[in-house]
Amino acid sequence: MALLTSLYLCSRTVYAAVGTPTGSGARVVAAAQTELPEGCLINGVITNEADLTAALKEFFTANKLPMNRVALIAGGSQFMHRILSLPAMSEKKRMAVLSHELASGGAEVKAPLDDYMLLSRDARTRVDTVLATRVEQRVIAGYDALAKAVGFKLYSIDLGLAAPIKAVRTIPDLQQKTFVLLQFDDDTISACLFVQGQYTYSTRSRLFNPRGSAESGTEIAQKLSGLIQFHTTSKSEHRIETVCFAGSTADDLAVCRPGCEALGLQVDRFPDSPTVRLPSGTALADVLYAAGNLIAR
């Protein structure tokens, strides 16, 4: 298969991973990142197309990134999502049910595009658990226009949340764990809850205190405490044991560790995957969204 350039666009830092899907993971041959000019991309929303276009042109050129097949992974509040349980049915009927459920859940938009990702399948009951997502057509049109302006060929667009879900599937040690994946994305934190290796819930919020400060460590501990309380009220029999950090610095880990341990959580970096091959010196935790996007669903 020809190389794909996976491009993660959400906050000020842009990540790219060049590679191909494999039968059980992905092969990444190059990875790069850059910081965008301030104010051209905020929480996945393009706010200054001219500056963003110029910065991405320079990023692709400086890192010699292939431009003929770009798999975009986008995040932010423009993408709405829900977990749904659906019985066996035709694809046409399934999409109709998804549309109804997303609309009834407050995701009513003028011109929606709906999609879903299979999370698990119960062979006995023939019920599928899916991650359904909705985005307005104008958002996708905006990314298509950006691709044309920068000069790359858009191969696919996927929901940011899909990348860590796919990455977790490739790591045997996480399959029976109940943990929180904490992804640092500039001044934004995404917290994804996995119960026995299955994605269950996520939140995304801004940090009010500077990263690496003692105050940010306290703030993050408060966010985790709220997530633990939410999980407890769901009456799950599985206790949250660990918090895995991705996109974090040594300072982030240092200031967060005391608060996490006070909550009874083990602190780890998100582990590498045995089936995601990365360039020497690159950790999966540092390129999780861009690399995870290369893993086939």
Predicted features, each with a name:
Residues M1-R297:
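Hydrophobic/aromatic-enriched cytosolic interaction surfaces used to assemble or bind macromolecules
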